[in-house]
A protein has these predicted regions:
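Secreted, disulfide-rich extracellular signaling modules
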Residues: 2-6, 12, 18-438
Length: 438
């Protein structure tokens, strides 16, 4: 059963009168006046919600690494990948010699943590092929069994800003076995089903003392295994055979332990949302771990006390990230989305711009010098007009999250501050007109 968790932490909006000269409208028997009024601190009730899982199968970016944060807790990102078979027809006039077997990794530019520290990754073999029934999928919470011992481990230093390619030489014994089987025309290369039975796939597992999570591209060449070999006849010719990730059976798995943080008691499900007033006046949003937000305006109808008739002229929502919670080790998302829901949290639509067509994305403003005036803003004029004067089942709410792509492929994050004792808190600026009969 759903619980109504409306918080009464806000005070009535403070009205700063910016009145026009009284205007007489005709020579009616009833005198009337219009006023322009500006309200600058309409309260915002922002809550944090946790998704129970996020589908990460088939993503074009994977995440690898481990990071411990005082705000978020301990997070590990593991990548599971099935590889596709590759075509090879040996020439009986040639002999073949191995050069190397290389894993090619290309950073996506995303990171979370200290990029100056080294990361150590162990590569395990999946115990069995990934098989999905019609109603199954692969999620950030999915855990698949691996062999007990790693095939190989390697260390690298993240360079997300430069997107410097990471090339990892895999064991020659593995490369030689692949080459021997290819030359012998072993039939497990004939189809993908045969190939995955012989070689179920790899799991990239970070060590638990790492202090950075790095994003890597996944495509025909990135996260690929490349067999470098020589064709030998009268001369030697270098060749490369590539085994790329079969993205239909590959995903990023996340392990998150929020012990010791404001998130520790949060349970998954929108019915378990927690208001910022119960989380240290903070609200959390992050990709891949599944945190997003709900926004309500519990005192919106208090505007009615300003006059007999209230006409909303404009409404702008301002959301402030917690100072010093970003940039050094984490990345603010450039785009965030607002979704309109009904009382039962059924999605109805996006929040659009003034043209009624363009989806708003938060209009991020960054204070490069001091960081105090960094904020997201949304034009909520139409939404506030539609909801002013409503209550109960007629009152709409807003859900806020990263874009679908960032939610499933990055750890981009925002911690919003909503402390009523601070100047920069979540707020709704409303300009409106009032009409009073005299």
């Amino acid at each position: 059963m759903k619980k109504s968790l409306y918080s009464l932490f806000a005070v009535l909006a403070i009205f700063c009168a910016c009145q026009d000269e009284n205007s007489q409208l005709g020579k009616s028997l009833v005198e009337s006046s219009f006023y322009n009024v500006y309200a600058d601190t309409c309260s915002v009730d922002i809550s944090t919600i946790l998704l129970d899982s996020i589908e990460t199968r088939g993503d074009s970016i994977c995440q690898l690494g481990h990071y411990r944060s005082s705000a978020w807790g301990e997070v590990s990102a593991t990548y599971y990948a099935e590889y596709s078979t590759s075509d090879f027809t040996p020439n009986t006039d040639y002999t073949y010699t191995l050069d190397s077997l290389v894993l090619r990794m290309i950073p996506s530019g995303h990171f979370w943590g200290d990029t100056l520290t080294q990361q150590r990754i162990s590569i395990y073999r999946l115990k069995k092929p990934i098989v999905l029934d019609n109603d199954e999928d692969l999620y950030n919470s999915t855990v698949l069994p691996t062999e007990d011992a790693p095939l190989f481990s390697f260390t690298f230093t993240p360079c997300p800003g430069r997107k410097k390619e990471v090339s990892v030489r895999l064991p020659d014994s593995w490369g030689q076995q692949l080459l021997n089987d290819l030359v012998a025309q072993d039939d497990y290369f004939d189809t993908q089903d045969k190939f995955k039975k012989k070689f179920p796939g790899l799991v990239f597992v970070p060590e638990n003392d790492g202090q950075c999570i790095t994003g890597f591209m996944v495509n025909d060449s990135a996260m690929s295994i490349n067999l470098h070999y020589q064709e030998v006849s009268n001369q030697r010719t270098g060749q490369v055979l590539t085994f790329n990730v079969n993205t239909d059976y590959a995903y990023t798995g996340i392990r998150h332990d929020p012990t010791g943080t404001h998130l520790a008691s949060l349970k998954s499900g929108i019915e378990n949302l927690v208001h910022s007033s119960d989380m240290g006046c903070l609200a959390y949003m992050q990709g891949l771990t599944g945190y997003y937000n709900q926004l309500e305006f519990p005192y919106l109808n208090s505007l009615g006390s300003a006059g007999q008739i209230v006409s909303i002229e404009s409404a702008t929502l301002y959301l402030y990230p917690l100072a010093r919670s970003y940039n050094e080790v984490s990345q603010l998302p450039n785009d965030i989305r607002l979704y309109i829901t009904d009382e039962n949290n059924v999605l109805e639509d996006y929040v659009y711009g003034s043209d009624g067509v363009t989806v708003q994305t938060g209009d991020l403003t960054i204070d490069e010098m001091y960081g105090k005036e960094t904020y997201y803003s949304f034009d909520l004029t139409e939404f506030i007009r539609n909801n002013y004067g409503t209550s109960g089942i007629k009152r709409q709410k807003l859900l806020m999250s990263l874009t679908d792509e960032e939610s499933t492929t990055t750890f981009n994050q925002v911690i919003f501050t909503n402390d009523p004792e601070q100047e920069n808190q979540c707020k709704l600026d409303i300009r409106f007109k009032i009409y009073n009969e005299q």
